[in-house]
Amino acid sequence: GQADLIVCNCPNSRLGSHFQTRVLKEFHDVFVANTDYFPVHTVQTELQELLNYPILMLSPKSTTSEYLREAFTAHNLKLLPEVELNSNDLLLDLARIGLGIACVPDYMLKENDQLTPLMLKEPLPGRQLILAQHDSLTVSQAAERFIEMFTSIL
């Protein structure tokens, strides 16, 4: 079968021009650290400086990984993460116990957390969470209802 809808991050190199997209949420990726283990400053941190620490990020095939590698490449830097996982929750857990500096979407952060967001001198561009549907597919009534319900909770 084929999927009626795709919920994914954008930019996404796997989505061609044959998809209609709807922005669900705007967000920024942030690097976070437990300051008990990493002496990050309240001043702005350069991307180059981040490379001196163990970086925790999503797996290489994720749109987030692709996006981050491109952002570092744009500054003539090569991003070599220490750990690559398939879960933002696990990245946050590892950062909390001091195993590295994690890169996660800002909406994953909680107030009063042990983690401190790093202020970057070279801010990362914002991204979107989008809903995509293929131009050639007719969206079913069930999918339309799902879209209504899904967008109402965001």
Question: Where on the chain are the PLM-derived regions?
Answer:
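Active-site-adjacent beta-strand anchor residues
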Residues: 57-58, 84, 102, 132
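A late-sequence structural motif
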Residues: 119-154
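Short, well-ordered beta-strand core segments
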Residues: 6, 55, 100-102
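Secondary-structure junction motif
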Residues: 39, 53-75, 139-143, 147
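Acidic, Gly/Pro-rich loop/turn segments at junctions of secondary structure
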Residues: 1-53, 107-110, 124
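Hydrophobic hinge/microswitch elements
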Residues: 2, 64-116
